[in-house]
Amino acid sequence: NATMLIEYAIEGRRRVKEQLKIMAGIEFADVNLGYIDEETDQETVISVPEQTSNSLVPDTKLPAGHIFGVGKSSISNEMCIYRLENKTVKGTGKMETQGVNQKNVKESVNAAWQFFQSNARQIIPGVKVHNKDYLLYYADTQGKGLSEEVSLAEFVGLCSALAERPTIESLAVAGELKLSGTLEELTHIEDIMRVCKNAGAKRILLPMDAIRDIQNVDRELLNYVQPIFYNDPIDAAKKALDIY
């Protein structure tokens, strides 16, 4: 009947808007579509069956070792959000990865791994890093190609897996950790905040230097995504894991 056809058409249009919301800017944040019955004046909003939640980042605690990182895709150059799933098993201190094929991304993951081996005890005192093996699945959640800019998130994820302690809820991490142990200067703060909002993240870890750039960020983004500032990678991990 006519109602079924209308709802089918609106459902298709909403799927398009859901994808635009993920890929594009804040102008696509409102995805609700529906119709008003002229006879009853009743408004009906059409949902998408598979979109029980339109958030990539859930508003609940993730399993220990799982974390979301934000960075530019090394293929499309778009700012994206990625899910890094780390777990530990009994072993001898080796690391294996799945989903990591590009050389620059492998180097980024290795930077996180090297820093983790040297510094995990500063976050989890007394822990024995080399009594475990570490497994990483790097999920390209938006299908844009992997990023080499989420190495800080991977370091935090490794700490979370080893400590068997989840990160705080609805968190994304921004920051590129280099092999030297230093952090790359973070730019495009507003783009990072927008991607986090569109993905459903309520909190974002940012370096202390980003405070000066926050002043220029759209107020609506700041009302939705709470910035949490860190001084260095150790501080970032402690704040992500709520360890003080």
What is each model feature region?
Residues N1-K21, E39-Q42:
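Conserved AAA+ ATPase small/helical "lid" subdomain
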Residues I26-Y244:
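Peripheral, non-AAA+ core regions of ATP-driven protein-machinery
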